[in-house]
Amino acid sequence: MHEQEYLTPQGLKKLEDELDFLKSTRRAEVAKRLHEAMEEGEVEENPEYEDAKNEQAFVEGRILTIETILANA
C-alpha cells in the first residue's frame, strides 16, 4: 500500500497536465524516434535507438509515478 499524498490544487493541476502531456505528446514522439532508429538497421550498435529506448523507459516510469501519486492524493 502506498502512502497518502497531499497536493495543493496547483500541484494537482501541474501533475495532471504533465501526465496528459506525457501520454498524448511525449509517448508519440518517443515512439516515432524508436521507429526511425529501427529503420536505420542494426539496433544493437545504434546509439540513437539506445537513447530512444532509455527515453521511453524514463517517460513510462514518469507516467507510472504520476499515476501512483494521483491515485493516492
For the regions a language model picked out, list residue spans one by one.
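N-terminal cationic and glycine-rich segments that engage phosphates or anionic surfaces
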Residues: 1-58, 64
